[in-house]
Amino acid sequence: MEDKKFAKERFIDGFLGGVEDWDNHLAEAINKDENPYLKDKLLKILKEQEDFGNAINSGLGREMWYSNDFFINSLILDFITGAEDDLVNELKQIWVGMLGKPGVNVEAINMNDEFEGYLIKMHFEMELNIHLISDLVAYYVYGMQISSERERVKLFPEMAELLLYLIDKKALLKKATEVAQNDQENQEDHNSPRLNIASELYEAGMKFVLGHEIGHHFLKHTESTGRNIVSKFVPADVTSNQLHLDEFAADNFALDLLISGMKERNDNNLLAPLIVLLMLAIYDKTPEEPNQSHPSFRDRYLNLLSRVSEHDEKVASGLQQIFNNVATWINYSLSESGYWKTEWWK
């Protein structure tokens, strides 16, 4: 009997634009003569990844086992390190493929008997948007630590610029081109409190998104026969729609996976899943309404907030206040009369 191919081969062979090493692919695609700044920056990133891999993976450098994206591979390794014994072997069957396609999309691919492993595909725009919303919210959270109102007000133009990039990728491309042409570097201190907040939100946001898709696989939502809805992941009295229940269960699985990996209390890790939903809601004019396959963003947000409240009610209350304030600011920044028809987060 012929050995089955693994999910990695399924991705590279089956998806247009699928490559074995995403970061190296980006670096090789840039002509140094045409864009020396970007070329040097991408090569620097590869070198930093090599050094990081040598430090944490016994000198194995950029060796990747669970994704074609170095950062995502590192996140899966984190999951494995912090997982209960019964999850470790399952997590080692995950493979995440990054694609350079437009669209805020990540998907657990249905199982195929011809291949081993669990395949997840992610579009680059999803990771980019998690980065942008993390930066945006980090300005607000950092501002909460500043006593001077005048200094806090200075942060809003930065937030407005990031919001523009979330809704207008042409504006982001224009900015990136200007930076490349002028060899501009971000002068913000890499050890600044705001950047630390943004980094924590970004990492936890990515873990939540990956954990959600891993949940779809582990709860058997991607299999053609049988389901394995673990009752603790299904919220009570929410809906009888099976597809909606799948989404709630995957959200809860992802949050539990995130919390189980926390070595110490970190409120930003718990805020991150909420702001991922806020980012996705920007592309939905009616976040209070469900569609055929997904519950409303309002219900998903309130479900996660309830789960955080079970973990720590005081923390949940603080995160709710942050979410309310940022969502309100986004709503009226995008339109004086309100971007969304309702204040769905309240």
Language-model segments: what does each one mean?
Residues 189-192, 196, 200, 209, ...:
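Acidic, metal/cofactor-coordinating or nucleic-acid-engaging core segments within structured domains
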Residues 1-5:
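Long, charge-dense tracts
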Residues 78-82, 249, 253, 257:
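Amphipathic alpha-helical segments that form well-ordered structural scaffolds
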Residues 206, 211-229, 256-262:
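Catalytic Zn2+-binding segment of zinc metalloproteases
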Residues 145-149, 234-235, 301-305:
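Glycine-rich loops and low-complexity Gly/Arg-rich segments
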Residues 219-248:
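Post-HEXXH active-site segment of zinc metalloproteases
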Residues 17-207, 219-222:
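Peri-catalytic and regulatory segments of divalent metal-dependent proteins
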Residues 7-18, 22, 30-31, 37, ...:
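Long, well-structured alpha-helical subdomains associated
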